[in-house]
UniProtKB/Swiss-Prot annotation:
[4Fe-4S] cluster binds at C268, C271, C303, E310. Its cofactor is [4Fe-4S] cluster. Keywords: 4Fe-4S, Iron, Iron-sulfur, Isoprene biosynthesis, Metal-binding, Oxidoreductase. It catalyses: (2E)-4-hydroxy-3-methylbut-2-enyl diphosphate + oxidized [flavodoxin] + H2O + 2 H(+) = 2-C-methyl-D-erythritol 2,4-cyclic diphosphate + reduced [flavodoxin]. Binds 1 [4Fe-4S] cluster. The lineage of its organism: Bacteria, Bacillati, Bacillota, Clostridia, Eubacteriales. Pathway: Isoprenoid biosynthesis; isopentenyl diphosphate biosynthesis via DXP pathway; isopentenyl diphosphate from 1-deoxy-D-xylulose 5-phosphate: step 5/6. It comes from Ruminiclostridium cellulolyticum (strain ATCC 35319 / DSM 5812 / JCM 6584 / H10). GO terms for biological process: isopentenyl diphosphate biosynthetic process, methylerythritol 4-phosphate pathway; terpenoid biosynthetic process. PANTHER family: 4-HYDROXY-3-METHYLBUT-2-EN-1-YL DIPHOSPHATE SYNTHASE, 4-HYDROXY-3-METHYLBUT-2-EN-1-YL DIPHOSPHATE SYNTHASE (FERREDOXIN), CHLOROPLASTIC. This is 4-hydroxy-3-methylbut-2-en-1-yl diphosphate synthase (flavodoxin). Belongs to the IspG family. Its EC number is 1.17.7.3. InterPro entries: Dihydropteroate_synth-like_sf (IPR011005), IspG_bac (IPR016425), IspG_bac-typ (IPR004588), NO2/SO3_Rdtase_4Fe4S_sf (IPR045854). One of its GO terms (molecular function) is iron ion binding.
Length: 353
């Protein structure tokens, strides 16, 4: 299939063993919602994120105890860790001493140039990148006054001012995020930023909301930018289990053909032609397919109109009949299956592929 999306070429940086930017695959990030000082709970959550396919995880660093906990956490997990730092540059230093893979901070918020130079110097020495993260709710007062409130242009100016502070101390291992809770403002800000710099962009919609509404806002905002070639790593922000962020993030990438792994499920919305309980069948099959390590396309169709004809590009699928379904592969009908056996039989067929 022709690649319809041409990604912007950005500078490539390395976070642990993951590359961001350039021709690197778009990575999916999350953030723990445990107290980082609770090492056991934090490790448990990170392992759940690893299992879900998370590439990079960020942790809140509230104090020195949280910073030193990074060292113990690193011993038990595989994915790169990002320290989320606000105001106190000493916490960034302590995290780097304990092996963190990346720092998220805004240099304008940690004090004078000496402090910026200290953090940037240590990060450069250890090969640790820094992400500048501008959010609409934390734009500097002078910029708010200049632009008359929060604007995409103001957020970009803020981000580039922080970038300049790092560049002025000869640090260029930088990623940038520039998020708003407003989807249109987020899109406008990233579009503008992508025209002004070549640093890799961490894309997301901040404070997106609960799982349902946040998924929609994130899919629209992140999806729009990725479709334009903007974005090198993504984070879906949801009020809920961080594992859900990974599921949504990966599905956004799959929807744009930017991630080609795992089972892709296509299913019809059903209509009056459907003679089997396709909704229950689809809902029963989906979680079972998530456990199978296959790179295939599975079609779950309600009738012979939608499948196998319209779904003939699927590797395998079913099409509803009267109290039974047709099993097909690449558009070719294999056999009929009673409705009550369809889930078991389809999973068995897929497992053997």
């Amino acid at each position: 299939m022709e690649d319809c999306i041409k990604r912007n070429q950005t500078k490539k940086i390395k976070v642990g063993d993951i590359f961001i930017g350039g021709d690197s695959p778009i990575s999916v990030q999350s953030m723990t919602n445990t107290d980082t000082r609770d090492v056991k709970a934090t490790i448990h959550q990170i392992k759940s994120l690893e299992e879900a396919g998370c590439d990079i995880v960020r942790l809140a660093i509230l104090d020195n105890e949280a910073a030193t906990a990074i060292g113990e956490i690193k011993k038990h997990v595989k994915i790169p860790l990002v320290a989320d730092i606000h105001y106190d540059y000493r916490l960034a230093v302590e995290c780097m001493k304990n092996g963190v893979d990346k720092i998220r901070l805004n240099p304008g918020n940690i004090g004078g140039n000496d402090r910026v130079r200290t953090v940037a110097g240590m990060a450069k020495e250890r090969g640790i990148p820094i992400r500048i993260g501008v959010n609409s709710g934390s734009v500097e007062k002078r910029i708010l006054e200049k632009f008359g409130g929060v604007t995409a242009e103001g957020m970009v100016e803020s981000a580039l001012a922080h970038v300049a502070m790092l560049e002025n101390v000869d640090f260029n291992d930088i990623a940038i995020s520039i998020k708003a809770s407003s989807v249109p403002m987020t899109i406008a800000a990233y579009r503008l930023l992508s025209e002004k710099c070549l640093y890799p962009l961490h894309v997301g919609v901040t404070e997106a909301g609960t799982v349902y509404k946040g998924t929609i806002k994130s899919a629209v905002g992140i999806g729009c930018l990725l479709a334009e070639g903007i974005g090198d790593t993504i984070r879906v922000s949801l009020t809920g289990d961080p594992v859900e962020e990974i599921k949504v993030g990966k599905q956004i990438l799959k929807s744009l053909d930017l991630l080609k792994e795992g089972i892709e499920i296509v299913s019809c919305p059903t209509c009056g032609r459907t003679q089997v309980n396709l909704i229950d069948i689809a809902n029963s099959i989906e979680p079972l397919l998530e456990k199978l390590n296959k790179n295939i396309k599975v079609a779950i169709m309600g009738c012979a109109v939608n499948g196998p004809g319209e779904a003939k590009d699927a590797d395998i699928g079913i099409a509803g009949g009267v109290n039974e379904v047709l099993l097909f592969k690449k558009g070719r009908i294999i056999r009929k299956i009673p409705q009550e056996n369809v889930v078991e039989e389809l999973i068995k067929e897929i497992s053997e592929m």
